[in-house]
């Protein structure tokens, strides 16, 4: 569907004709009569048009049967999609409306009104929502006053729809009649509950003309959803003053204020976990617009004093965050007034709290003799937050919450004993650098960095009631009051061995001390080196390498995984040949956080640039970062955790759960060739590759057979790559005509590849680990559970392509007038397995292996439980047009509503005619 056109093309033609009479006075004045240029302004008209075609399923509106293979349309998408280029990803962070615009203005006016003062004005993309202004007034060498204003939009999606309406800032209501009917269906018997998917999606008996389609509200809830474009607008203003009191002393100050206002998507769960069902007592969830309305304020006052051999500076910085919406309330679409533990009628979310931060900055530098220089900075900080707590819950069915003082109070009231957090943190950043030149061509640098993050927030007792499943157990926030201290010591030597050539070698140590984290202390040692050679003018060569090894003293699970028998913490570092015991609660004892666990890092970068002749320049670069977390010991297991080992192993040995490898590399090449003084060509190519490998374990309560067995370990890898091609040409004719054109393609792919590592059958030891419903006739210690909906299977590939063609023509009509014409074409092709199949309702599906079991929702799920490969039933009715084997929906989403957030593909044309006026 094409966006609506206007008469802007005619405006472009008229604008071009108005430029023609200027040739009558195109002669330039003699050079001696030319005044100095004070600035320039570029203004004109533009027009953009195109198609948003990336969601053909939405363009057709809802399917009348719920099966896109039997009737065109999508499942649960609401009314037909109305594509507008202005709300698409094409204008995600900009405002390119058609018509008149001012691209930029830059002007400096000295000796204002015969005085010694000056004024400077600058703008970028003036007038519309994507704009920037800077004004400066001052006296050279004496003082300067600046005013700056910036504005930028952010459009999140143009495919969203909802029936939520905002009745007050941050308060969202859902139509009463629909809530009542959904509650009635969920409160009925199993047959009544089974009609919820059809009622939501408008299929089966609830399809137009169906037996239950008595009115609009009965013919599919999501089919009545209204379009809603979540977006925010950011506005920021700055005032700064700088004054040189003496040639050596400068005083300065700044005030910055930023506001953000609008809406963005957020998900709410009206339950204690994401699991849900059709019953009124089961959980439910909904995506709603998050109301954004807050200010950031920054104040800075400081001064600098400097002499020839030393200098000092100091400043005070204050940061203040003010949120105009301190909480958000949303009605539960699936529960009108059936108040019960575990089934709330409203959801409550605490928004970002108001907070303040204060910093003092001190810095100085001095020469310690002729060959030594010392630089230092000390920056203490104080962070405060004391926002009032919200009530434990809005659910009146929960009573008797502990308030931290041993008594009981209503759960719908805020904590009585501790009404607010009294959040208190203190930071200290110190940097010391000593540089010396012991010999003519040698430089030695020693640096010490110290950072303290002390969380002094008092420990309070609370009674969490997340999900309103029951009256919670009193607990405290002690484990969340994390603190850390980081110290770095670096020694570096530089040798300038030849003209424009140097070599560097060094060592760095980093000590980390943490509180209320899994690792209390760790040490990372690094060695590095680099070489930079430009001795021969045509050749430039740069290379660097860094090796780092981080080791924790001891890995203690802060979540406290406990033994099923003794209740003691389960260690991961058991003796060789001993299997870690099963656990009852907390994390798997060998799970590791990547920012704390042992790691080996290798990093290398290189650059070569060669100019064999004046007309030709060739360049190439490459870089790689490899993080290896799969270390034996050092807080990890001393023996492989694989269930299958030796010749039967399905993967290499692993000693932890979590990320094992994180690898990224890039390379590229470029060439610039001057065909003549007027024409030059350029071409560039770059490739980026990212790869992460992790291993996890599927867990169920240990009361179930095989609940904690390495036979249910699974592996996931996430290869991603991006390729960028660019070719173009620059043409300059007689210093009058400038023509630039280029084509660029950015292509990216992302995959998530998963597989199980155990065995569904008889293992090499002769034990029957096969999956059987009810756990009959199989071994509890190795029962295979990765079947059906929990099978480890590959996700569909996500793909992104961005083509852009540009041509810019510029002509020097006179010394002051430069007409410019610009054309751009952009095509964005995109599909993401997380968003492209997304609609407002994803619960209209039939059960595993039983197409049609839900009336009007004949969408097949994964095949029955005896499958361990994660295969889908074939054919797949109701699949996404982007992913023929990808099922749109899940039976567990029967009581979930979504906004349908996506950013569809588009192609857009852009033309503009502008005039640069230099004055």
Description of each model-found segment:
Residues 45-51, 123-129, 139-141, 149-155, ...:
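Transmembrane beta-strands of outer-membrane beta-barrel pores
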Residues 113-120, 141-145, 248-251, 261, ...:
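Repeated loop/turn-to-beta-strand initiation elements of outer-membrane beta-barrel proteins
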Residues 42-46, 120-124, 136, 146-150, ...:
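Transmembrane beta-strands of outer-membrane beta-barrel proteins
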Residues 24-113:
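Outer-membrane beta-barrel initiation region
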């Amino acid at each position: 569907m094409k966006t609506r056109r206007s008469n802007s093309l005619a405006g472009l033609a008229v604008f071009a004709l108005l430029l023609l009479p200027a040739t009558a006075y195109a002669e330039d004045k003699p050079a001696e009569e030319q005044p100095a240029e004070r600035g320039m302004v570029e203004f004109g008209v533009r027009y953009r048009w195109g198609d948003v075609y990336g969601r053909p399923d939405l363009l057709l509106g809802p399917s009348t049967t719920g099966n896109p293979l039997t009737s065109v349309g999508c499942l649960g998408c609401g009314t037909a999609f109305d594509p507008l280029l202005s709300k698409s990803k094409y204008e995600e962070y900009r405002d390119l409306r058609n018509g008149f615009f001012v691209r930029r203005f830059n002007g400096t006016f000295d000796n204002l009104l015969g005085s010694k003062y000056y004024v400077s004005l600058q703008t970028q993309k003036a007038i519309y929502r994507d704009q920037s202004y800077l004004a400066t007034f001052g006296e050279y060498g004496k003082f300067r006053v600046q005013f700056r204003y910036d504005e930028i939009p952010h459009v999140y999606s143009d495919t969203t729809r909802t029936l939520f309406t905002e009745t007050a800032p941050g308060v969202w209501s859902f139509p009463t009649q629909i809530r009542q009917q959904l509650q009635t269906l969920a409160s009925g018997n199993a047959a009544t509950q089974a009609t919820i998917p059809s009622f939501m999606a408008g299929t089966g008996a609830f399809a137009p003309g169906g037996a239950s389609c008595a009115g609009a509200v009965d013919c599919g809830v999501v089919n009545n959803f209204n379009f809603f474009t979540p977006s925010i607008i950011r506005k920021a203003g700055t005032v700064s003053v700088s004054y040189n009191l003496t040639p050596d002393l400068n005083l300065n100050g700044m005030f910055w204020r930023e506001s953000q206002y609008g809406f963005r998507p957020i998900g709410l769960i009206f339950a204690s976990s994401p699991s849900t069902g059709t019953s009124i007592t089961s959980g439910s969830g909904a995506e709603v617009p998050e109301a954004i309305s807050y200010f950031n304020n920054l104040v800075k006052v400081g001064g600098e004093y400097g002499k020839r051999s030393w200098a000092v500076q100091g400043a005070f910085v204050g940061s203040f965050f003010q949120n105009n919406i301190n909480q958000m309330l949303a009605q539960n679409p699936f529960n009108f007034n059936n108040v019960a533990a575990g089934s709330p009628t409203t959801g409550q979310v605490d928004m970002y709290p108001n907070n303040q931060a204060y910093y003092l900055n001190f810095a100085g530098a001095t020469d310690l003799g002729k060959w030594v220089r010392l630089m230092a900075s000390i920056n203490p900080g104080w962070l405060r937050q004391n926002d009032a707590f919200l009530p434990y819950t809005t659910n009146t069915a929960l009573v008797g919450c502990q308030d931290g003082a041993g008594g009981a109070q209503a759960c719908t009231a805020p904590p009585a004993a501790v009404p607010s957090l009294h959040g208190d943190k203190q930071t200290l950043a110190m940097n010391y650098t000593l540089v010396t030149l012991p010999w003519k061509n040698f430089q030695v640098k020693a640096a010490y960095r110290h950072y303290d993050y002390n969380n002094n927030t008092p420990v309070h007792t609370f009674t969490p009631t997340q999900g309103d499943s029951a009256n919670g157990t009193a607990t405290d926030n002690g484990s969340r009051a994390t603190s850390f201290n980081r110290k770095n010591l670096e020694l570096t030597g530089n040798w300038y061995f030849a003209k424009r050539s140097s070599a560097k070698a060094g060592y760095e140590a980093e000590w980390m001390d943490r509180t209320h984290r899994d690792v209390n202390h760790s040490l990372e040692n690094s060695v590095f080196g680099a070489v930079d050679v430009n001795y021969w003018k045509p050749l430039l060569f740069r290379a660097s390498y860094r090796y780092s090894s981080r080791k924790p003293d001891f890995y203690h699970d802060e979540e406290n995984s406990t033994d099923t028998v003794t209740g003691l913490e389960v260690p991961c570092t058991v003796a060789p040949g001993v299997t870690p015991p099963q656990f009852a609660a907390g994390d798997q004892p060998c799970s590791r956080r990547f920012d704390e666990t042992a790691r080996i890092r290798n990093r290398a970068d290189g650059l070569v640039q060669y100019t064999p002749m004046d007309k030709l320049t060739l360049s190439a670069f490459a870089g790689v970062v490899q993080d290896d977390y799969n270390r034996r010991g050092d807080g990890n297991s001393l023996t492989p955790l694989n269930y299958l080992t030796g010749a039967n192993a399905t993967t290499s040995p692993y000693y932890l759960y979590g990320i094992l490898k994180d690898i990224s590399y890039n390379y590229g090449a470029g060439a610039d060739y001057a065909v003549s003084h007027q024409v030059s060509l350029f071409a560039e190519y770059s490739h980026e590759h990212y790869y992460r490998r992790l291993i996890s374990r599927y867990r169920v309560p240990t009361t179930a057979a095989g609940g904690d067995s390495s036979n249910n370990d699974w592996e996931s890898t996430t290869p991603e790559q991006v390729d960028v091609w660019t070719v173009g040409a620059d043409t300059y004719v007689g210093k009058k005509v400038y023509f630039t054109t280029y084509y660029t393609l950015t292509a990216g792919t992302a995959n998530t590849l998963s597989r199980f590592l155990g065995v569904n059958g008889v293992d090499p030891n002769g034990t029957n680990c096969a999956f059987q419903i009810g756990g009959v006739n199989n071994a509890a210690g190795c029962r295979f559970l990765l079947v059906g909906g929990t099978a480890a299977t590959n996700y569909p590939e996500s793909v992104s392509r961005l083509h852009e063609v540009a041509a810019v023509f510029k002509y020097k009509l006179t010394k002051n007038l430069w007409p410019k014409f610009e054309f751009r074409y952009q095509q964005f092709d995109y599909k993401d397995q997380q968003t492209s199949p997304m609609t407002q309702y994803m619960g209209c599906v039939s059960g595993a292996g039983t197409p049609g079991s839900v009336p009007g929702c004949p969408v097949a799920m994964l095949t029955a439980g005896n499958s361990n490969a994660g295969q889908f039933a074939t054919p797949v009715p109701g699949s996404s047009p982007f992913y023929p084997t990808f099922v749109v929906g899940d039976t567990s989403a029967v009581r979930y509503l979504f906004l349908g957030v996506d950013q569809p593909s588009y192609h857009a044309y852009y033309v503009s005619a502008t005039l640069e006026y230099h004055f």
